[in-house]
């Protein structure tokens, strides 16, 4: 083992704005990103891992992703929101910060909840999960099983969630489901 640090680990999850890398998307640049990327090696107290977007029908024990110390080569691929969050925490707290990014563009909050909770929602058609009738990013529970649940063994200080636009058509239920998601996530991380 090399380059180990003792500090705090945070989880950053959400949709496309959490996915957006430091170098931006095509035709969607990020202001001052070149300077932030050039400065990345000056932050040895930060570690980042992006969990590979994976959908699964059952909760997985392991996910794909490796911890990285920021360099000018790898920083452009880091989630911009997650990296800026890590920078702010590290500068403020003056301790090492690790960030786990679990994100999928366009996903709904239901994609980040387990089957046991989804079964209580009368408006959720769980028969569509795993089918080609609905785009994967809109399906319930798949991100939870393939991306989020495998990270529950990490000890984390907390988490941030960025977005909710894919739930715009279900705005009446979003607030309650977001609160349920937060409560469930806190329970699996024993917070």
Model-derived regions: residue spans:
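Cell-envelope and extracellular/periplasmic
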Residues: 1-191
